[in-house]
Amino acid sequence: MKFLDQAKIYVRSGDGGNGVVAFRREKYIEFGGPDGGNGGRGGDIVFEAVENLNTLIDFRYTQHFRARKGGNGAGSDRTGAAAPPVVIKVPVGTQILDDDRETLLADLDAPGKRIVLLRGGDGGHGNAMFKTSTNRAPRRADPGWPGEERWVWLRLKLIADAGLVGLPNAGKSTFLSVASAARPKIADYPFTTLHPQLGVVRLSMTEEFVLADIPGLIEGAHDGAGLGDRFLGHVERCAALIHLIDGAAGDVVDAWRTIRGELEAYGGGLADKPELIVLNKMDAMTPHQIAGRRSALERASGCKVMVISAAAHQGVDAVLRETLRMIREQRQ
């Protein structure tokens, strides 16, 4: 399934039904009086977050949603039927933005959460509503009120407990595949992963968390370089970050600073999230190189650095345990 995390759609609620002009007509009743009923309400536009979706790809093919008009009134004071709502199902974590892509209208961040974005128009009054002591037989009925319409943007921010960040080819996809049942594409070239990947990490029957692999960032991503920073939005909801660094690539401190700079430039509190720095590919380094690069990273970051080999399954469990501890600390 293709991944799509942004979509623009048109929504319109239903018009209200028209009121009707009608008079009571029965045997032996010469002047029955007005009995025209009111129109029914138009259909609402409702958004609902559901668990079994993880992409907005459906909105690439269906971009217009219109609710039905309410039923017209009828004689004998019968009110028109209200039109059913149009329920638009979106993945959990979807934000609804105005056409300017800035104004947040709703944040559907929990399964089952619903929002009535547009209300259907009210039904018009039938002539029975206009009867007075001086106007016993009104011939006036109102049309239904029009519905509302607007263009909106849908933006998906995946719900994950921890985010996996790092430069391209740092080994993030390999780490995710080892840590969870996810099977992302893995290859020895930059930008193998083009879309965020989610995996559930199960440490025991009662201990698990969701890990998101964010496509590789490069210097200048916040200005659109590489894949840009659009996928950083998926990290905003994470409680902790695993910063994976390719230990065999050379200047590990420069690699760490590059990603830190992008997190700070993006904003949104990303730079303030708890960060676990992990030096990957220990199997491709000598013990002397491991000690030197680990020490340099710890001096630059002021944090403890863990060393692993995702490909050889070395040290991964310890990283996952520490990540779970950080998540629990943040969620309290």
Curated annotation (Swiss-Prot):
Q: Does the keyword Metal-binding apply?
A: yes
Q: Kindly list the positions annotated as binding Mg(2+).
A: 173, 193
Record's keyword terms, sorted: Cytoplasm, GTP-binding, Hydrolase, Magnesium, Metal-binding, Nucleotide-binding
Q: Do you know which Gene3D superfamilies this protein is assigned to?
A: GTP1/OBG domain (2.70.210.12), P-loop containing nucleotide triphosphate hydrolases (3.40.50.300)
Q: Where does GTP bind?
A: 166-173, 191-195, 213-216, 280-283, 309-311
* Example of a GO cellular component annotation carried by this entry: cytoplasm
| Sequence ranges assigned to domain Obg in this UniProt record | 1-159
Stored PROSITE patterns:
G_OBG, GTP1_OBG, OBG
Q: Which GO terms describe its biological process?
A: ribosome biogenesis
> What functional role does this protein have?
An essential GTPase which binds GTP, GDP and possibly (p)ppGpp with moderate affinity, with high nucleotide exchange rates and a fairly low GTP hydrolysis rate. Plays a role in control of the cell cycle, stress response, ribosome biogenesis and in those bacteria that undergo differentiation, in morphogenesis control.
Name of the protein in its database record: GTPase Obg
Origin species, per record, is Acidiphilium cryptum (strain JF-5)
